[in-house]
Curated annotation (Swiss-Prot):
One of its GO terms (biological process) is translation. It comes from Bartonella bacilliformis (strain ATCC 35685 / KC583 / Herrer 020/F12,63). Belongs to the bacterial ribosomal protein bL19 family. This protein is located at the 30S-50S ribosomal subunit interface and may play a role in the structure and function of the aminoacyl-tRNA binding site. It holds the Pfam family Ribosomal_L19. The gene is rplS. This is Large ribosomal subunit protein bL19.
Length: 146
């Protein structure tokens, strides 16, 4: 391992200690919390959209998020280990078969939606068994009206 790769690995480990990013992939809808500085004030702004690409590896890894804002498509590239990213929340998983979803740029409206991935194996389904109460036999006297 050369010195540059070693320094990058140390920086990745240092940033990973501060915040834990979820394991998301292309097609997932994510909410990225970005620290924005306006003048002297700093605030955290949420940017929610579909992850359409991941590129690079190690310290140079990036991901691209696309959202529709007021009818216009907006894409933003985030460095994975940027100190300006406060965190990433996974909103929903998407079912895609491509590594890059650049074809979404040409689609409009409902055609640009991505189907949700449903993983039935990981879902904890608890079957609640009804406890059958012991049947109580009531002694009912039958009378006949004459």
């Amino acid at each position: 391992m050369n010195i540059i790769a070693q320094l990058e690995a140390e920086q990745c480990a240092k940033i990973a200690e501060k915040r834990q990013l979820p394991a998301f992939q292309v097609g997932d809808t994510v909410r990225v919390m970005v620290r924005v500085t306006e003048g002297t004030r700093t605030r955290v702004q949420a940017y929610e959209g579909v992850c359409i690409a991941r590129s690079g590896y190690g310290f140079n890894e990036n991901f691209t998020v696309r959202k529709i804002s007021y009818g216009e498509g907006v894409e933003r590239v985030f460095p994975f280990y940027s100190p300006l990213i406060e965190g990433v929340e996974l909103v929903r998983r998407g079912k895609v078969r491509r590594a890059k979803l650049y074809y979404l740029r040409a689609l409009r409206g409902k055609a640009a939606r991505i189907a949700e991935k449903r993983d039935y194996r990981k879902k904890n389904v608890q079957i609640v068994e009804e406890e059958v109460a012991p049947a109580v036999e009531a002694n009912v006297e039958t009378t006949t009206a004459e």
